[in-house]
Amino acid sequence: MSKFAKICVVVLCGITSVFCTSCENMFSVDYRIVGSWQVSHTYLNDVEIDSTIYLGYAPQTYYNIYADHVMSVMARYGGEYRESSFAFWVADQKNKTVNFQYTFYGKVYDFTADILKLNRNEFTIEFTDEKGDRWRLQMFSRSRH
């Protein structure tokens, strides 16, 4: 192998390792979860529902998730959209879960959900609440069209 070919191989290996390292973050939950998501389908114990007293889980609710682990939840209440307060999220890449904590209209929401699907257009989570009811929220991206 010529000296030029060896240099080319070394350079290509270096570029590939740098590229793979920087792309690794693109596949992490922390990277992919960031965006604006709209709840399109809500399931309670495997039955799709159109409304619920838990505004944070209702269809047409927005989860605006930011990279610094802050978020906002916006839901319809009294014909207007209202926004949550004290909203945070933390993802666990290894266990494929996400914890959401926020206060919305006097109710504190604090739950850890299994991530069933997360890609650039769809985000589906499932969790069991303190009463033992199983919720599944299917959300679609509002920020990546």
Predicted segments, located by residue:
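Bacterial N-terminal signal peptides that target proteins for export
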Residues: 1-9
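C-terminal motif of bacterial Sec signal peptides marking the signal peptidase cleavage site
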Residues: 18-22
